[in-house]
Amino acid sequence: MDSSKPLWSSQPFKALYTSYFLVKTPVHLLLLSVAYTVKPLRPQPAWSVKENVRAAMARMLFSFWSSIRSQRPVYTAPEKAQERHARVEPPPAAFFPGAVAPSDLVKPAAVDAIWFPSPPSSDSAELAKQKVILHFPGGAFVLAFSHESSGRPIADALSKHFQADRVVWAQYRLSGTPETCFPAAVQDAVTFYHYIVSLGVDPANIIVSGDSAGGNVAVALARYLQDSQTKLPLPRGVAVFSPWVHVTKTAGQDYDQEDRSQADVLHSSVLQWGADVYRPQGQLSPETEAYISPLHHPFEMSVPLYVQAGSAEGMHDQIRSFSEEMASVRGNRVLFRSTPLTPHNLPFCHDQFGKAKELGESLDEAFEFLRPDN
């Protein structure tokens, strides 16, 4: 529940704050552009002036969206995808046991799958051979971005480097009400995965991926598939990029205390907002806590897990610790990659920070690691 809503999230204060932001921000960025010509003044000295300014602008935007509680700042309705859009109903209740079970408030719901580059084949024999990536996008559980301007470049990169036929852009429900807190996003992940399997796609040809909060959802789906007694098969593997693994009651404060956080693209306010509305109210069971915040809650995985983090991101050390904990579980196959001088969420930020080469290398490495014969 969003009990800490800022004053600026309601009219007329939202309009006033928006006007102030639109006037102030260009001036602020101009002043930073001048200040950052002096290398010691740059938050990240190894980055160029332009890269530091872009990171500052991202922090300002995240802070602004958090202040006015704007959940779809750059959004494209799923219906705009036309024939690539599929409205998917959730599977029967038996597929939602334990921590993801329906409650009086949080229940499985229909989801919108967006296919790239085109809808799946109707030929069952052909579909069985299709290689499909199920990708969960980031957004701190509270922000959704356009499946075109944001989703298409990510889908194109995944298709190319993972040698996949199709990518499903899987936007789960955003949190913000008691009906959309955990386990809503994981229930949606189960619905997406069940949908792809029910089409006839061979699970050995499915890779689950996610970035930032979407990486958290991908890890939660892996935990569910490993632990639940449902008959959903395991995918080939899981690849996550800058996964948000430490979703605590004090997420914003935790982030600010991390090295590199003040230079990265994220702002602590968006993480605190996300944690406030994603985490259910009251005392959580150990099982629920493990799903929400997987750091310090490693689990057995029968499929390989690839984890990437940027060495310049505020979440780097948390993600590395999560990877080490997962790798310590007997039988787990985990590969962690720290990408040099890279901010949070390489798939999302690679173009703005000139990291296309690094993204390609990371995806190629992930693909090789997740190969069945590896």
Residue ranges and their predicted role:
Residues 1-127:
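A glycine/proline-hinged amphipathic helix-loop "lid/cap" segment
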Residues 6, 17, 187, 200-205, ...:
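Alpha/beta hydrolase fold serine-hydrolase catalytic domain that processes acyl esters and thioesters
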Residues 112, 117-161:
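Short, surface-exposed "cap/lid" segments of acyl-processing enzymes
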Residues 114, 168, 335-339:
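General small-molecule cofactor/ligand-binding pocket signal
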Residues 116, 135-139, 209, 241, ...:
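Short hydrophobic segments within beta-strands
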Residues 140, 172-176, 245, 343:
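Alpha/beta-hydrolase active-site loop signature
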Residues 151, 165-205, 355:
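Catalytic nucleophile-loop/oxyanion-hole region of alpha/beta-hydrolase
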Residues 210, 214, 218:
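Gly/Ala-rich beta-loop-alpha elbow adjacent to hydrolase catalytic centers
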